Amino acid sequence: MYKTILSTLFFAGIFGVTTLQAQEAINSVRFGDNGVVYLEDFEHYDVGSIPDEWYNRDGNNIPATYDELYRNDYKYKVVQEDAKKFLRYEGTEAKHLNFPLIDKKEINIFETPILKWDWRIFDIPEGGDEDSSSQNDVAASVYVVFDTSRILFQKIPVTIRYTWSSKYPVGSIFSKLRGRQKIMVIGTGENNLGKWQTFERNLVEDYKNIFGKTPPRTPIAILILSDADDTRSHIKADYDDFELHPAR
């Protein structure tokens, strides 16, 4: 997938456009009376479209507005089954989608620390290895990005990336970008392929456990990525119902 230098540019890029995100990001985040923050359920998008509230990896453009040639590089589209809409990735190439939260100051993960979402994995990239720079493919992953500090006058975030792994056991943790990205395996292998599964992660606890300190109260973005470009596999995965919940 992306080599180290590109990964570094990725994280620098997110912070290079945070002002733009704060000024322009418009999304359908809803705050329920039950304390739940409803981030995204894909229900209000047209079937077959790239959701227009999701940005490119660096957060400075919206793929849904691209010319067709460039828009087709993004293998994500809204799909409907019965009454349910969701986001599907189907392809090989790696493209992130970025759901900005930097302007959602009402979000406080100390009040709603549980990130909950559904995904459905159909294929895993054979030989995918998220701990390798040359085979770094995963069927599905969710990044939670936090604004924390500056390095040499450049803002560099820290990120937790939750993955469905081709090979590693659940609970495996890997470190990238000099420890500023932590990869946590939460699903693995071919078990339950083709079935919707719900995952919940306590962001505050995970952050404290893997970074050893307290997180900022509001993430700056959630990103998703499915890719199989290093292994040249063809994969399919679905995403839906991103929410933040109070602690159980």
In which residue ranges do the predicted regions lie?
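Extracellular carbohydrate-recognition regions
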Residues: 23-65
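Short edge-strand/loop segments of extracellular domains
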Residues: 132-152
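Extracellular beta-strand elements of beta-rich domains used
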Residues: 42, 222, 240-244
